[in-house]
Regions:
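Bacterial N-terminal signal peptides
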Residues: 8-19
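Extracellular ligand-binding/catalytic regions of CAZymes and related secreted enzymes
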Residues: 22-81, 89-106, 110-112, 118, ...
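A conserved amphipathic helix/loop scaffold
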Residues: 27-30, 37-41, 130, 146-206, ...
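Short acidic/proline- and small/hydrophobic-mixed sequence motifs that coincide with surface turns
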Residues: 66-71, 130, 152-156, 606-609
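Cytosolic/matrix-facing juxtamembrane and C-terminal tails of multi-pass cellular membrane proteins
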Residues: 495-534
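Soluble catalytic regions of membrane-associated enzymes that act on cell-envelope
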Residues: 518-639
Length: 735
């Protein structure tokens, strides 16, 4: 009987696993949530096309903690198959407890690689990664309108409107027979102040054709946001203003953009007679025939019984015309705006404003400022098909004007090979040919001396060991001569070379500038390349002279800088910089009637190797124009005529290439031809083939600014040369 309890215990233990489960292991502690939250998107919205250049990514950092949070935001653009050469930009953040902060990060598309994968990482002040947020980006090249209204009601009517355009920066981008739609974008607004969150560098507008803004918002802008917008307009952008209050017209910024204080007038009858532009089906709109400015004011009867009058389409780079026949009446009723829209319309004049088919328009630098006679942001204008068509036409016109600019703000080359000529012009190694020739001569002499001559002496003296004694001497002498020649040509220390192109409107002092900065070092060296000013952006053009392909763009209050660059000895690193520049004076281009043009130099410097192109006539060469000097185009040496310009295509639009072979015309002496070709060939190669260097409707002045001020050092290296070139477009200025 004593064994029964033991057997019972054994039986219980045997079945225990099926009737009893041990307590489950405690779950691992949940990961600690990050102390901040991050949201990132392109500054004009995640659906807005940013084009194939620079753009801003707006990052909102929310801090729900009871203590301030600070660290670094890092944006990375890379391709899955080529993660060794990403684009990286960084900016610090510091968010007080319970607050929200907005941080702008710079980005650009990858040459020959599209948008790539864009991510924003947040790190704390110790470098630990907190968050990794993907950023959707649309890099389509489209005519984009940014509507700075809150909310934007025009987007419903205009988004995807088939654009009737001819110009394309990439001729095959839209296929055969297809038509791109107008891209629509709108900025975010600061929840605390109600102000729009706009780019603080003009490169942030790289993918934008036109900006629509009420004047009460413009008058509130200040600091970097205002400077970026104005610089973008001066560089070729189009700003459409909706006057909201009488006092806005007296604002200094508004007056400066209009060339003087504007004031309201009755709506021009010709504007009211403009026909309604129906929404295209995708095949485009037929443009009426162009009539010369001399015919302004005439009226005539069309074949269909419609009566017409003439209205200029645009200021045409500071000059009125060409003019467009406008239908004023047609059997079946008016084609103008609705009566409710007309009742609220007003015209404007004053300053340099000219009445055009888009509104009262002034030229500002290379860009345009349009004072709209209607308000497209609210009823009745926003619901009027006539208003919708006018705005669409304005965006299309703004897009077409981009063809006249060699380096539009925020643009980057479509192909990396385009900068090869620029790299060669900035590379001291390209000047090593004399050194190579000297080395070849030294080696030839060495081979003769150490060979036949030394052995002949040995035979004459009967000393068979003489070559063994003298050969090392001749070898050391030849080696030393070659090394000294190499050091003499390449230099004992590093140095920098620079080349810039300033594009500017006639009569204006602010223009857009594209700088190429070459850095040549004699040793492995860590470089930090800072921007010339806080409004410029930087990027590495060629990495042949870099030990590591990775570099990052650091953004702070003082501007941007490329860091983490380690250069290789005797190699050249080239950096591209985009910004704006204010010249000490302007270059005036004055219409003297017919095909006559006078050019007046107010820059304070001598203009060297000047080319003055007169539309419909020819390009004329002048060796120099002194400060304060005036030349008449007809008195120069003819390089080529308008009929002999080299033509190309950009989409379905005809453009005219720079073609340095025509600048280096046989009518010039050989030294001048070589200098002109060496100066302008790198610029021609760096610009896309879609540039209309010699427009049909605007004069162009090309020149080198002789004696331009430049820094003595660049990123710690001596500046060996700094060439500043000018391209002046349009009419304007004073004697």
């Amino acid at each position: 009987m004593s064994r029964l309890p033991a057997l019972a215990t054994a039986a219980v233990l045997a079945i225990a696993p099926t009737s009893y489960a041990a307590p489950a292991a405690a779950p691992p502690p949940a990961a600690k949530p990050p102390p901040i939250s991050v949201a990132a998107a392109p500054i004009f919205g995640q659906d807005a096309p940013v084009g194939s250049g620079w753009y801003d990514v707006l990052v909102r950092v929310d801090n729900p903690q009871a203590t301030a949070q600070k660290g670094v935001l890092e944006l990375r653009v890379s391709q899955p198959w080529d993660n060794e050469r990403p684009f990286v930009s960084r900016a610090p953040y510091n968010v007080p407890a319970g607050k929200t902060a907005y941080v702008r990060l710079l980005a650009h598309s990858l040459p020959e690689g599209g948008s790539g994968e864009v991510h924003v990482k947040a790190r704390d002040d110790k470098g630990a990664e907190l968050l990794d947020v993907p950023v959707p980006v649309n890099t389509a090249d489209l005519p984009v309108l940014v509507d700075v209204h809150e909310p934007s009601r025009l987007s419903v009517a205009l988004r995807g409107w088939p654009a009737s355009i001819r110009y394309s920066p990439t001729p095959t981008a839209w296929g055969y027979g297809s038509t791109p739609g107008i891209g629509f974008a709108a900025p975010s607004f600061d929840r605390a102040t109600g102000d729009p969150l706009l780019p603080e560098r003009k490169a942030g507008y790289g993918g934008v054709a036109a900006v629509l803004m009420p004047t009460d918002v413009l008058t509130r802008l200040q600091g970097d946001a205002l400077d970026a917008l104005v610089s973008w307009v001066a560089g070729g952008g189009t700003l459409a203003l909706v006057p909201m209050r009488p006092e806005d017209l007296r604002n200094p910024t508004v007056a400066a953009l209009a060339g003087g204080e504007p004031h309201p007038i009755p709506t021009p009858p010709a504007l009211l007679a403009l026909p309604t532009i129906p929404r295209p089906s995708g095949t485009g709109i037929t443009v009426p025939p162009v009539i010369e400015p001399e015919d302004e004011g005439i009226g005539f009867e069309g074949e269909t019984g419609a009566s017409f009058q003439l209205l200029p389409t645009a200021p045409a780079h500071g000059r009125r015309g060409p003019f467009l026949p406008i239908s004023t009446s047609r059997r079946g009723g008016s084609l103008g705006p609705r009566p409710a829209t007309v009742a609220k319309m007003s015209g404007y004049e004053g300053g340099s404003l000219v009445q055009t088919a888009h509104g009262a328009t002034s030229t500002y630098g290379l860009g345009e400022v349009v004072f709209l006679s209607y308000d497209p942001s609210q009823a009745p204008g926003v619901d009027d098909p006539w208003v919708q068509g006018r705005v669409a036409s304005l965006v299309e016109h703004a897009w077409e004007r981009r063809a006249n600019i060699a380096f539009p703000p925020g643009s980057i080359p479509k192909h990396s090979w385009r900068t090869d000529e620029m790299r060669r012009s900035l590379d001291p190694n390209e000047n090593f040919r004399p050194g190579l020739g000297f080395a070849a001569i030294v080696l030839a002499i060495y081979s003769v001396v150490v060979g036949p001559i030394t052995f002949m002496r040995s035979r004459k003296k009967g000393d068979p060991l003489l070559p063994l004694r003298w050969a090392p001497v001749w070898s050391a002498a030849a080696f030393g001569a070659i090394v000294i020649a190499g050091l003499a040509v390449k230099g004992w220390t590093g140095r920098s070379r620079r080349m810039s192109l300033v594009e500017i409107g006639a009569g204006f002092t602010r223009g857009t500038i594209r700088r190429y900065r070459g850095f040549f070092t004699s040793e492995t060296r860590a470089l930090k390349v800072g921007a010339t000013d806080a409004a410029s952006v930087l990027d590495v053009v060629t990495g042949d002279g870099v030990l590591r392909p990775r570099s990052s763009l650091a953004v702070d209050r003082d501007g941007v800088a490329l860091d983490e660059i380690t250069s290789l000895p005797w190699q050249t690193l080239v950096v591209r910089e985009d910004g704006h520049v204010d010249l000490p004076g302007s270059i005036a281009v004055l219409d003297t009637g017919g095909s006559g043009i006078d050019v007046v130099n107010h820059t304070g410097k001598v203009l060297k190797d000047v080319v003055v192109y007169v539309p419909g006539d020819a390009a004329h060469y002048f060796a120099a124009i002194p400060d304060g000097g005036t030349v008449s185009a007809a008195s120069g040496t003819v390089l080529f005529t308008s009929a002999t310009r080299r033509a190309g295509s950009a989409g379905s639009r005809i453009v005219h290439t720079l073609d340095v072979t025509t600048l280096a015309s046989p009518v010039l002496d050989e030294v001048t031809r070589d200098r002109m070709e060496a100066t302008w060939r790198p610029v021609e190669s760096a610009a896309d083939e879609s540039v209309d260097w010699w427009p049909d409707d605007a004069p162009v002045v090309l020149a080198e600014l002789d004696g331009a001020d430049h820094p003595r050092t660049d990123s710690g290296l001596r500046v060996e040369s700094d060439k500043v070139l000018l391209r002046v477009v349009g009419y304007g200025g004073a004697r």
